[in-house]
């Protein structure tokens, strides 16, 4: 037994492996999983002249299945406030030396929006330009009824998991194929409906992005639960085997009747004792059992496969599924009112900026020829550069600090780290990780880590694949919104990879301020340049 990995565990602590869970460390570490034996466990009958196998368990394959499941525990949800909620907490804010700048910024935004609406009223006798007003409120009822229908259709993924849990179908055989075809149909339906209804750009972007969110939520839910359903089937088989092995331990007659072997691909098989077989089977069964529990350990599959759990997941501001999210104790009405008020105020500012800076720019180039557009493009870029970066910041705050925090408060979701301090970014890869945490976690789990574990890609290739998929989705949204297939945003996003390499050069290495200056130059010029490209060309 010198070449066989030693399983350092006694049988007694594993006697109740299905119910006993060590809460502080529910899921085994990668090092523990890698310590499992790379072989097959074979049970043979001593009296069989043909030396046929009674049962055979591919421990190596099951080990790889357990290791692949680590992808569903690559991000730990934990209670935390968003950055702006922390810095505006009364206890912190009153002591901050920068509180005056925070107040000044929002007063400046309020003064700006009042100025723009006042100018609109004096010059046009209306608070909002007629073309934009028509666009914003066009097909309003159709938009939200269509969105509600797409939400209802997403329950197909829940129904499929119910069928899998009831053993009507298996995820590995038919479930995966059905889910893939369904999500393809769901995406085609969303695109068809956008084009069929001819939604204006605002409605088109909202509907498309929300459908993309629903697709990602369904993908994460179905693949996570599908994986656990396969783990449950395998765990039940190991439970039966463990019962059989323990019967052999307790019965001299059975112990003398059966023999246990470990077979290896490149060396002779080795006979092991019944006690050693019990150790190996019990440990593997224990790890399989823990895969069916939530990260904290309080929820066990299939208890989470129910209607209300899925509804809760749709409302929770997370794109990846977890069997048990951290929660806050109380719902705060004053907090919800503040976020709702902030949302409407920021929407008013957004409409004013679009009305006075972006709509006139689009109108100015509408009837020009190509040469005329080239001549006016630099002037338009200069005009919208500052409004574009302000609009970018406002949209970031609106989505990630107001809307997501509002849904977090509704569901009492405690992990509100929806973004990091991306404004201090030194490299572009840091920006891609920090500015949109929900999407980053989804891509990290279901693209980056899954491509490494499932397709054996190198890390560099997995990074490229992740950036490519993200860029293609952004370009597809712009195609639907503008009707133009130009690959501008696709190119700019993929340029982040060589820009990261550029920032690793000596000129930027260990010069965080210089790197941050380089980042903000890109932020000032990038959004405005993209706007001009899509407006003019």
Curated annotation (Swiss-Prot):
Main location group: endoplasmic reticulum
EC number: 2.3.1.-
Membrane-topology descriptor: Multi-pass membrane protein
Motif annotated as FYXDWWN motif, chain positions: 418-424
Localization per record: Endoplasmic reticulum membrane
Keyword Acyltransferase part of the UniProt annotation: yes
InterPro entries the record matches: MBOAT_fam, Oat_ACAT_DAG_ARE
Signal peptide limits: none
Entry's Gene Ontology molecular function annotations: ergosterol O-acyltransferase activity
Pfam families (UniProt xref): MBOAT
Entry superkingdom: Eukaryota
Cellular component aspect of the GO annotation: cortical endoplasmic reticulum; endoplasmic reticulum; endoplasmic reticulum membrane; perinuclear endoplasmic reticulum
GO BP term (any one): lipid droplet formation
Assigned keywords, A-Z: Acyltransferase, Endoplasmic reticulum, Glycoprotein, Membrane, Transferase, Transmembrane, Transmembrane helix
Residues with attached carbohydrate: 250
Active-site residues (renumbered): 474
Record field: transmembrane: 98-118, 140-160, 174-194, 199-219, 344-364, 384-404, 462-482, 517-537
Family: Belongs to the membrane-bound acyltransferase family. Sterol o-acyltransferase subfamily.
Role, per record: Sterol O-acyltransferase that catalyzes the formation of stery esters.
PANTHER family (alphabetical): STEROL O-ACYLTRANSFERASE, STEROL O-ACYLTRANSFERASE 1-RELATED
Record protein name field: Probable sterol O-acyltransferase 1
Organism: Schizosaccharomyces pombe (strain 972 / ATCC 24843)
């Amino acid at each position: 037994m010198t070449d066989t990995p030693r399983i350092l565990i006694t049988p007694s602590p594993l006697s109740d492996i299905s119910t006993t869970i060590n809460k502080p460390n529910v899921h085994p570490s990668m090092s523990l999983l890698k310590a499992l034996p790379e072989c097959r466990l074979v049970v043979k009958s001593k009296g069989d002249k043909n030396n046929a196998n009674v049962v055979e368990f591919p421990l190596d394959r099951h080990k790889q299945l357990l290791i692949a499941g680590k992808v569903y525990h690559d991000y730990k949800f934990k209670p935390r406030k968003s950055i702006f909620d922390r810095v505006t907490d009364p206890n912190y804010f009153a002591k901050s030396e920068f509180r005056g700048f925070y107040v000044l910024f929002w007063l400046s935004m309020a003064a700006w929006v009042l100025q723009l609406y006042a100018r609109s009223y004096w010059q046009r006798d209306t608070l909002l330009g007629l073309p934009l007003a028509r666009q914003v409120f066009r097909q309003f009822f159709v938009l939200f009824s269509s969105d509600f229908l797409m939400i209802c259709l997403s329950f197909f993924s829940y129904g499929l998991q119910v069928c899998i849990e009831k053993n009507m179908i298996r995820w590995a055989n038919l479930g995966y194929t059905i889910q893939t075809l369904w999500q393809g149909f769901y995406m085609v339906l969303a695109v068809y409906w956008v084009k069929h209804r001819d939604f204006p750009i605002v409605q088109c972007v909202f509907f498309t992005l929300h459908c993309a969110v629903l697709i990602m939520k369904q993908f994460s839910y179905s693949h996570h639960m599908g994986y656990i359903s396969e783990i449950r089937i395998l765990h039940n088989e190991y439970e039966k085997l463990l019962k059989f092995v323990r019967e052999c331990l307790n019965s001299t007659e059975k112990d003398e009747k059966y023999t246990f072997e470990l077979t290896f691909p490149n060396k002779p098989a080795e006979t092991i004792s019944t006690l050693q077989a019990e150790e190996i089977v019990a440990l593997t069964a224990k790890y399989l059992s823990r895969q069916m529990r939530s990260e904290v350990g309080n929820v066990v599959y299939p208890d989470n496969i129910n209607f209300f759990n899925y509804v809760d997941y749709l409302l929770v501001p997370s794109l990846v599924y977890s069997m048990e999210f951290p929660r806050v104790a109380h719902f705060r009405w004053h907090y919800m009112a503040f976020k709702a008020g902030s949302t409407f105020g920021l929407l008013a500012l957004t409409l004013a900026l679009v009305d006075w800076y972006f709509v006139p720019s689009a109108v100015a180039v509408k009837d020009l020829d190509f040469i005329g557009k080239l001549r006016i493009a630099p002037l338009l870029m200069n005009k919208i550069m500052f409004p574009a970066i302000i609009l970018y910041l406002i949209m970031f705050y609106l989505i990630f600090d107001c809307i997501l925090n509002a849904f977090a408060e509704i569901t009492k979701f405690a992990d509100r780290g929806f973004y990091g301090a991306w404004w201090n970014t030194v490299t572009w890869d840091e920006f891609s990780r920090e500015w949109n945490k929900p999407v980053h976690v989804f891509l990290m789990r279901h693209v980056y880590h899954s491509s490494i574990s499932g397709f054996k890609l190198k890390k560099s290739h997995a990074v490229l694949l992740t950036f490519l998929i993200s860029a293609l989705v952004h370009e597809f949204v712009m195609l639907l919104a503008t009707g133009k297939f130009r690959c501008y945003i696709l190119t700019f996003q993929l340029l982040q990879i060589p820009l990261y390499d550029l920032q690793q050069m000596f000129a930027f290495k260990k010069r965080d301020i210089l790197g941050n200056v380089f980042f903000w130059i890109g932020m000032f010029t990038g959004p405005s340049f993209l706007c001009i490209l899509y407006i003019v060309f």
